């Protein structure tokens, strides 16, 4: 069983907490993207990144200093978004760390797919970037079926804790031998059950930690997850779509 999550836009360096253990599986393809980005002018990169001046400056600095082989940070520590903060991998026990290295995969527009202890460097390249001037019109086309093939090489089931944008790297390539279970976290807003992005990211991070601590191997055991008072709702769930709902007051958290 594999678990997929999305990366975070905010990245940091951390070479002290845990050592790098592995090399990204698709590093050869990442070098192609690196070469393309470094061949672009500042104006072309501004168009590509479509970001604020501050973010563009940071991204240019990252790109100028990019080295895919040295001074690397384990992927699980390199991303510092909400999901990763609530996952809190720096507090994991060794069995939990071993569990995520084996089972957790971080999807990425730049690296394709990462194990938690793959060594990476900071980058900016969102999956939905319009790749003007590149050999492929989109990163979905560039990565094609590579990621799905790798995910399902040893496992028939993938737990999807990624965003809709990133699950598109996998969903088109499902078949009768490939099962993906999407987990959805909902709250009651204006008398309708909705997914609130920030709170869903918090819950996804907590669920990864729950799975690692409990060494979850059976998807059905995910139903025992209750952080933020989330409860599995069988009446609205299906075999491939697990829905959790809560009335937790996030404003007091």
Swiss-Prot record:
Gene Ontology CC annotations of this record: cytosol
GO biological process: response to hydroperoxide
InterPro entries named among the record's database cross-references: YaaA
Pfam families: H2O2_YaaD
Family classification: Belongs to the UPF0246 family.
Protein name listed in UniProt: UPF0246 protein LBA1843
């Amino acid at each position: 069983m594999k678990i997929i999550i999305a990366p975070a836009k905010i990245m940091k360096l951390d070479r002290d907490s845990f050592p790098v253990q592995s090399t990204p599986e698709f590093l050869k393809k990442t070098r192609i993207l690196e070469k393309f980005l470094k061949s672009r002018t500042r104006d072309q990169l501004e168009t590509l990144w479509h970001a604020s001046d501050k973010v563009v400056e940071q991204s240019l600095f990252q790109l100028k200093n990019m080295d895919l082989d040295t001074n690397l940070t384990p992927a699980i520590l390199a991303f510092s978004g909400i999901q990763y903060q609530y996952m809190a991998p720096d507090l994991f026990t060794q069995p939990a760390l071993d569990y995520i290295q084996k089972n957790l995969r971080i999807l990425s527009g730049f690296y394709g797919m990462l194990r938690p202890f793959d060594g990476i460097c900071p980058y900016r390249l969102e999956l939905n970037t319009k790749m003007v001037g590149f050999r492929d019109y989109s990163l979905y086309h560039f990565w094609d079926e590579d990621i799905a093939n790798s995910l399902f090489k040893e496992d028939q089931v993938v737990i999807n804790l990624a965003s809709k944008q990133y699950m598109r790297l996998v969903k088109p390539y499902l078949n009768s031998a490939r099962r993906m279970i999407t987990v959805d976290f909902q709250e009651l807003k204006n008398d309708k059950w909705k997914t609130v992005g920030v709170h869903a990211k918090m819950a996804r991070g907590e669920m990864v930690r729950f799975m690692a601590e409990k060494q979850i191997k059976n998807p059905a055991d995910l139903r025992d997850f209750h952080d933020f008072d989330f409860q599995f709702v069988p009446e609205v769930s299906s075999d491939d779509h697990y829905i959790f709902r809560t009335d937790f007051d996030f404003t007091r958290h």
